[in-house]
Amino acid sequence: MTTDLTDRRQLILKLAIQEFIESSQPVASELLVRKYRLNVSPATVRNELAALEELGYLTHLHTSAGRVPTDAGYRYFVENLMDRTPLSATEQRTIRHQFYQVRSELDQWIQLAGAVLARTAQNASVVTPPRAQQARLKHLELISIHDTTALMVLVLHDGTIRQQTLTLDMALSQEELSRRASRINERCADAPVERVEEFLKQERAHEPPGGDALACQVLDLIVKAMHQFNEHLNSDIHSDGLIEILNQPEFSQVERVRRMIEILQSRRALGTLIPRALSSSGVQVVIGGEHSYDEMREYSVVLSRYGGGEIVGVLGVIGPTRMAYPRAISAVRYISAVMSDLLAELYGIEGDTHWEVES
């Protein structure tokens, strides 16, 4: 929705959304005039609220005369109206200190990021480990174990190692195995799964029928391992903050609690958001009905990738659409910067963010 709003309507929409986020109660014109000392009458504000409802930014509940924001209203607020409210300098120093205390333990980074995000944004959090954006073949070795038995050692770009014992059709020396591995390395080094699949297709087309049996066997295993890696990339999600999100009034009903637990545990819906965050720069905000999964349409998600180059992860918060967006966005932005700088410092992974104190 790109409707231009007058300055007065923008102000009233901003105040109405801020008030609803803070109180969780439908917002009436009298309250806005009284609390924010507006220099207009309640009747004027009431007319403006009605106009904003006609434009699709607000709606009202049948049991109340007050208005509540729609998804379109929240979107307009996030893109045009909200004030940027960075974390305080004290909060930033505390967060940075916490991460430095565990800087050599990657698993603890992930747990700490989830806990700090949830506590800071007062919502549930999601974090994925830093990985290659997609599997790429770094190196292959074939090691002779016995006459007709070999060990395949596959190393992916992020350091992931896969091992598989192979049964050979004929006895092959270590020299011959190394030659076959070198040929695959030459053709597929730094290749994504699509290129490996293309090479496998070419091998199968060669004489003798079916091509080089060992090469095809090895390439087929590589393709399967890379597909598994890519699938795991979108499902390896650490979540935290269930206690924080259950403090929100939206979760006073048991059914909504059950649905939220299901979302955090199943990973299916959240997993669809990971590729979007990985392929985008900056903080991404997905609000309510913008989600492709129906079960996510009562919630908003604020996500950002962290890291740099090929090695990246995603972190963010999930909560009701009545989310304190400025706070959530600042928390996600700052913690992603901290994580990026840690990766750059410890692993030489260049990120595009730094630990400068936001102000």
Swiss-Prot record:
It comes from the Bacteria. This is Heat-inducible transcription repressor HrcA. Transmembrane segments: none annotated. GO terms for biological process: negative regulation of DNA-templated transcription. PANTHER family: HEAT-INDUCIBLE TRANSCRIPTION REPRESSOR HRCA. SUPFAM superfamilies: GAF domain-like, Winged helix' DNA-binding domain. The keyword Nucleotide-binding does not apply. Signal peptide: none annotated. One of its GO terms (molecular function) is DNA binding. Negative regulator of class I heat shock genes (grpE-dnaK-dnaJ and groELS operons). Prevents heat-shock induction of these operons. Keywords: Repressor, Stress response, Transcription, Transcription regulation. Belongs to the HrcA family. InterPro entries: GAF-like_dom_sf (IPR029016), HrcA (IPR002571), HrcA_C (IPR021153), WH-like_DNA-bd_sf (IPR036388), WH_DNA-bd_sf (IPR036390), WHTH_transcript_rep_HrcA_IDD (IPR023120).
